[in-house]
């Protein structure tokens, strides 16, 4: 099996989380602070190469009715650029409704100061996204 990388793409940051090779354990990675698409691509490619990733699981922020809103369209456009500029990766989208809310709640519950939460919230959201994806895959395979 291979490691899978999850992304929580925002306007200013990209939260990251990665699975182990057995796709059981999910670990948060440092958040990428977005600068330009080319620099973001280089940072992302470095992580992909470092961990031997072939699949990116990307949170798609759907509206509560399941439709794609403006932010979801931005995410898809951003990831279309990455798909065209990073060879050999598969991109899978996962509904990420309320993951940032859940991640923020965890940080509040663990007494992380308000000014420090932004450093962690996107990567924790990516962790939720990847765990959701892995749970769905296990359900499909009857595990």
Explain the meaning of each model-derived region.
Residues 8:
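Conserved catalytic-loop position in the HRD/HxD motif
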Residues 2-4, 12-143:
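Phosphate- and other anionic-substrate recognition elements at nucleic-acid/protein interfaces
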């Amino acid at each position: 099996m291979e490691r899978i990388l999850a992304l929580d793409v925002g306007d200013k940051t990209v939260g990251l989380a990665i699975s182990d090779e057995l796709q059981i354990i999910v670990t948060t990675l440092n958040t990428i602070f977005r600068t330009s698409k080319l620099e973001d691509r280089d940072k992302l490619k470095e992580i992909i190469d470092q961990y031997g990733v072939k699949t990116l699981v990307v949170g798609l922020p759907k509206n509560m009715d399941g439709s794609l809103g403006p932010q979801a369209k931005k995410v898809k456009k951003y990831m279309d650029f990455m798909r065209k500029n990073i060879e050999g990766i598969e991109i899978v989208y996962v509904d990420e409704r309320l993951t940032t809310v859940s991640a923020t709640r965890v940080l509040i519950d663990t007494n992380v100061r308000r000014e420090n939460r932004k450093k962690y919230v996107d990567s924790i959201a990516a962790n939720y996204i990847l765990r959701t994806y892995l749970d769905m895959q296990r359900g499909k395979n009857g595990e």
